[in-house]
């Protein structure tokens, strides 16, 4: 789960991480008033959406007066901001952050992230702040410093010093930088985050260290422990189908292709999408119904897949274990009765009660393609899509 920049900065301040003073507003008039209250110009007007790359898309603007802040906010609010992360359709801007401008001496990058390779936590830092860190990692990886932290031992002062020295910070900035790293790390651990990022972290002309931007990703599986964070969720920033799927405990991610797929298990789902692509088609979604799915969940899964107008065919790929094949088959029949399945359906299943599952489907009278293997299923899907 993600939250907005202004919400993240509120969390930052509770952990002793300095940020510019700012106000979140949702009208142009309020933006002008907020600009006048901040105590000096220029101010920065920043569109509040969950996607990155806002500056390049025109979502971050400098205002030298309250009237200019009002005008800029008016142009942003109600518009669709297009960034490299939103896709061509963009994201509707419903809030802006009006923030005090600061004098920047140096821009840095700083983040704390879960590292799967070491099963630990890594502090990532770079002097290439304010830039697309993925691009920096690809073109000039030597510019990124990594400090690995054992999660059982926790953060120590030497980790912070290692990062500070690696960034060539002036002596007077090392102590405030250490405080920022400590706060960021504690926030990461306390809230079960997968990423906490400041880009850029700035050194001001008066030697202060400050978070100019803020981003945090929370582990969805741990949100039951953080009701305060869950209350910050903005479903307007999320894909409507993904929000709907979450109501039924379905793991769904919308994609750009035209082959819907329903699978049990994340690994099998990713392999299924790979096979679809190898067969020359494109997956329209990732949908893991999980091992404990029942007929109702299967029906809801079909309803969500069919809500996507791009879908021209559906591939069901199930390895029956906890989710038995007969339960899946009953769910398919139930979905066909209650939800008009108006696209071709390809079903491949193996495992527990597979013969009973195949019998249920065979006697249902449904128009579907039964595949003997995953390769056969993908080939059938590709044929159906090509003929559509």
Swiss-Prot record:
Q: Does the keyword Nucleotide-binding apply?
A: yes
Question: Where, in this chain's numbering, is Mg(2+) bound?
Answer: 199, 213
Q: Which residues bind substrate?
A: 264, 321-323
Please list the GO terms describing molecular function. ATP binding; magnesium ion binding; succinate-CoA ligase (ADP-forming) activity; succinate-CoA ligase (GDP-forming) activity
Annotated ATP binding lies at 46, 53-55, 99, 102, 107
Residue ranges occupied by any ATP-grasp domain in the UniProt entry: 9-244
Cofactor binding, note field: Binds 1 Mg(2+) ion per subunit.
Pathway membership, UniProt: Carbohydrate metabolism; tricarboxylic acid cycle; succinate from succinyl-CoA (ligase route): step 1/1
User: What does the entry give for GO biological process?
Assistant: succinyl-CoA metabolic process; tricarboxylic acid cycle
Q: Which keywords does the record carry?
A: ATP-binding, Ligase, Magnesium, Metal-binding, Nucleotide-binding, Tricarboxylic acid cycle
Instruction: Give any Gene Ontology cellular component.
Output: succinate-CoA ligase complex
Q: Which Pfam families match?
A: ATP-grasp_2 (PF08442), Ligase_CoA (PF00549)
- Return the EC number: 6.2.1.5
Recorded catalytic reaction(s): these are: succinate + ATP + CoA = succinyl-CoA + ADP + phosphate; GTP + succinate + CoA = succinyl-CoA + GDP + phosphate
Q: Which domain of life is it from?
A: Bacteria
Ranges in a coiled coil:
none
Q: Which family does the UniProt entry place this protein in?
A: Belongs to the succinate/malate CoA ligase beta subunit family.
* PANTHER family the record matches: SUCCINATE--COA LIGASE [GDP-FORMING] SUBUNIT BETA, MITOCHONDRIAL, SUCCINYL-COA SYNTHETASE BETA CHAIN
Q: What does this protein do?
A: Succinyl-CoA synthetase functions in the citric acid cycle (TCA), coupling the hydrolysis of succinyl-CoA to the synthesis of either ATP or GTP and thus represents the only step of substrate-level phosphorylation in the TCA. The beta subunit provides nucleotide specificity of the enzyme and binds the substrate succinate, while the binding sites for coenzyme A and phosphate are found in the alpha subunit.
Protein name, UniProt field: Succinate--CoA ligase [ADP-forming] subunit beta
Provenance organism: Desulfosudis oleivorans (strain DSM 6200 / JCM 39069 / Hxd3) (Desulfococcus oleovorans)
Gene name in the database record? sucC
């Amino acid at each position: 789960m993600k939250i907005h920049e202004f919400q993240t900065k509120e969390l930052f301040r509770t952990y002793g991480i300095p940020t510019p003073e700012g106000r979140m507003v949702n009208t142009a008039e309020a933006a002008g008033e907020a600009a006048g209250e901040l105590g000096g110009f220029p101010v920065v007007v920043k569109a509040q959406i969950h996607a990155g790359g806002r500056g390049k898309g025109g979502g971050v603007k400098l205002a030298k007066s309250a009237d200019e802040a009002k005008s800029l906010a008016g142009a942003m609010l109600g518009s669709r901001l297009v960034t490299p992360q939103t896709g061509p359709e963009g994201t509707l801007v419903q809030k802006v952050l009006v923030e005090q401008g600061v004098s920047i001496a140096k821009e840095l990058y700083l983040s704390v992230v879960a590292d799967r390779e070491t099963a630990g936590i890594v502090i990532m830092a770079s002097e290439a702040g304010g830039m697309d860190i993925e691009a920096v990692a690809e073109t000039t990886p030597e510019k990124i410093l990594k400090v690995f932290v054992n999660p059982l031992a926790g953060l120590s002062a030497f980790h912070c010093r290692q990062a500070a020295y690696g960034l060539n910070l002036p002596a007077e900035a090392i102590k405030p930088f250490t405080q920022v790293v400590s706060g960021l790390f504690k926030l990461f651990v306390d809230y079960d985050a997968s990423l906490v990022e400041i880009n850029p972290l700035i050194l001001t002309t008066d030697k202060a260290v400050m978070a100019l931007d803020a981003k945090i990703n929370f582990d969805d599986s741990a949100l039951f422990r953080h009701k305060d964070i869950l209350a910050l969720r903005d479903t307007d920033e999320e894909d409507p189908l993904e929000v709907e799927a979450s109501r039924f405990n379905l793991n769904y991610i919308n994609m750009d292709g035209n082959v819907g797929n329903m699978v049990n298990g994340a690994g099998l789902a990713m392999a299924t999408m790979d096979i679809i692509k190898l067969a020359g088609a494109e997956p329209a979604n990732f949908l893991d119904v999980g091992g404990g799915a029942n007929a109702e969940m299967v029906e809801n899964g079909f309803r969500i897949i069919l809500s996507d107008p791009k879908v021209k065919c559906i591939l069901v790929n199930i390895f029956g274990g906890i989710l038995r094949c007969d339960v899946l088959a009953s769910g398919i029949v139930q979905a066909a009765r209650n939800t008009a399945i108006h696209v071709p359906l390809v079903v491949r299943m193996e495992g527990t009660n597979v013969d009973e599952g195949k019998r249920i489907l065979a006697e249902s009278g449904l128009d579907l393609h039964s595949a003997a293997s995953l390769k056969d299923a993908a080939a059938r899907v590709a044929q159906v899509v090509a003929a559509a």
